Design a protein with these regions (language model features):
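Charged, amphipathic alpha-helical coiled-coil/dimerization segments
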Residues: 112-169
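N-terminal leader segment of winged-helix/HTH proteins
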Residues: 1-70, 119
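Short amphipathic alpha-helical interaction segments
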Residues: 101-116
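Terminal interaction helix/tail motif
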Residues: 148-196
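Pre-recognition alpha-helix immediately N-terminal to the DNA-recognition helix
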Residues: 48, 78-82, 141
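N-terminal helix-turn-helix DNA-binding core of bacterial DNA-binding proteins
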Residues: 61-102
Length: 196
């Protein structure tokens, strides 16, 4: 039998009612993530962010595919470019920190894929924790070709956007702040999950 809050209460002989969340009346045509004006604005922002993220990762995969025959995802390209950043070897933990990623198994998969493809190589200890990754000569030339195609494609488009230069720095700072808010909100959600 599936254990629900009600069955747990019956089994314990308790007459307490399960906690209920305050109800918000939905407007006709609205939905569960946009019941108030603030929620609607947040939902619009989040959908824009989702579309941007998906377009960005498709762009990275397409840009790399134009200069290299190795089939990589946008996530793989992000790992490759971070490994190449500053031309200094990096540990998996550093790659995760730079990309704000905690999904270590997926990062390990991406680095193994990039090693097998000959774009990066390992250096140092055989310990997974201490292993560092660096771009190979092939990886270096592929990332250079990627950077050249990116420079020839995106900057001219962005410069055509009115006010792009002035807004880009402010937007970058705001995105970092919003990223911190989402991280904090995730912590709050986890603590609430364990409350009775």
């Amino acid at each position: 039998m599936k254990r629900t809050t009600n069955t747990a209460l019956k089994k314990n002989g308790s007459t307490a009612k399960p906690k209920t969340q305050p109800t918000v009346v939905e407007r006709p045509g609205s939905w569960h993530l946009a019941r108030t004006e603030t929620e609607r604005r947040l939902s619009d922002f989040e959908f824009g962010l989702e579309r941007l993220a998906q377009a960005y990762y498709r762009w990275k995969a397409a840009c790399l595919a134009a200069v290299c025959d190795v089939p990589l995802t946008g996530d793989d390209v992000a790992v490759l470019n971070v490994v190449r950043m500053g031309d200094e070897p990096k540990r998996l933990s550093e790659i995760g920190q730079l990309l704000n990623r905690v999904d270590v198994p997926n990062l390990q998969y991406a680095t193994r894929k990039l090693v097998r493809s000959g774009l990066i190589e390992t250096e140092g200890s055989s310990s997974r924790k201490e292993t560092r990754y660096r771009a190979t000569a092939t990886g270096h030339s592929v990332t250079e070709a990627y950077a050249a195609l990116r420079a020839a494609t995106l900057p001219p488009m962005l410069e055509a956007l009115d006010g792009w230069a002035a807004k880009s720095e402010t937007t970058s700072i705001q995105l970092d702040l919003i990223s911190s808010l989402y991280a904090q909100a995730a912590q709050v959600a986890i603590t609430r999950r364990h409350q009775p």
